[in-house]
Amino acid sequence: MKPADPSPVASAGERIAPSRLQRLANTAAGIGVVLALACGALAVGASSAHAAAAIVIVNLNEPGVGFNDPTPATPVGGNPGTTLGQQRLNAFQRAADIWGATLTSSVPIRIGASFEPLSCNATSAVLGSAGANEIWANFTNAPRTDTWYPSALASKLAGTDQATPGQPHILARFNSRLGLFPDCLPGAGFYLGLDRNFGDGIDLVTVLLHEFAHGLGFQTFTDDETGEEIDNLPSIWDYYLLDNRLNRTWVELTPAQRAASAVTWCGLSWNGPIVTANVPRVLAPSSNLTVSGAAAGGAAGDYQVGDASFGPPLSNTPVRGQLMPVVDQANGTGLACTPLNSTNALAVRGNVALVDRGTCDFVVKAANVQAAGAIGMVVADNQPGDVSGLSGNDPSIAIPSVRVTQTDGARLKEALQRRSRTRSGVVASLGLNTTRLAGTDAQGRILLYTPSIYSPGSTVSHYTTEAKPNQLMEPSINDDLTHEVTPPRDLTYPLLQDIGW
């Protein structure tokens, strides 16, 4: 990446204002993270008066818009604001207070913030963006020389403000039109309450906690697509990004090797000691599909699975039964998008149903096989790729469901070629792997998000989506997140501690 300004601006260090800031985008697959460029001028804002680190929200909006929008609003969820603008500012301040009470710094942290119209349409929208405004190397008291640090962290470590005079440490902008207009994701606006009772809305405080973390340093400044460093200097992150196949950190790898590890599923671990020590306190055992039985053949063994957001979670008491496929299409696949016919219902009754992804929602498939008497459901992906979960919500689903890759699904189907109407001789057991925590490598280190298909802005600078419980710094904002950033619920703050906070 071409640096914006490679020249020294202070006697003790070098500064760059990078254009790589994080943007949350609402897509068909959920909330993802892409790249953005943000800049702005300063104005007076509010501050956290009693925090271990004072965080100042600097209002960048002009009169009458954004934080200054006078549209009347009814207080909601502990947010006492009576205008839309004041409620927005209160939500920002709540997120700032949570981080301020967690961090320590003698230098107030300034977040330049605004609400403004961002890209959106009726089905998708950019939610907002936030990230470090500047990065610094070789400043006073820098723990590592020739290493990039985000502005807020560099200031904390130096004990004096490193930011360019008149500039914030973090920039944040969010979509002022979201959910308020028919051409901007109608019905899915920001929930401005402070109590997480967001219903069908998007909890702004949770999104802000995530985005502020990026600005505080939860990101690498090395180009994760090309592996190239800025001015041939590593980010502080790169000392803790471990290619677990090569057992080497990013600072020890070539650009090509870094780029390769960024698209190797489960191939990149966080090697920081504070995060690793807290992993057992935070993460739960991983979900697992074990296949056995006289007819299993080459399909026997353990399978990595994606969990469902509906139905009961897998537990230490496995759900175990014959694996039986649903076949309701002329090509031999089984979608289970309509009530099962008598042949398929007989096959899955009292057994674990194997169905294919496609055409209808996962909860529809689960409801149909459950109605036919299945005790569990395995969904085989219909596209190449990594393990993913099953989205959806239906409180009537009472059977466990998991998802396997297209490759693993093909292995299972091959083993099921010879079967009777009610038995396959292939036994599926849906349970937990108590020897492996969800989202970790073989050494118990948490994994970073490295999908095999590069995802701009999401790849590397997030935790894996395999973690359980869901973590704040996954690339998607999940409904079960709390406003906690510390153990025993969350591993965001331990990572910031690893890099110097």
Feature-to-residue mapping (PLM):
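Bacterial N-terminal signal peptides
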Residues: 28-43
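N-terminal secretory signal peptides that target proteins for export/translocation
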Residues: 1-24
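Structured lumen-facing ectodomains of secretory-pathway proteins
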Residues: 272-454
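Sec/Tat signal peptide C-region and signal peptidase I cleavage site
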Residues: 44-51
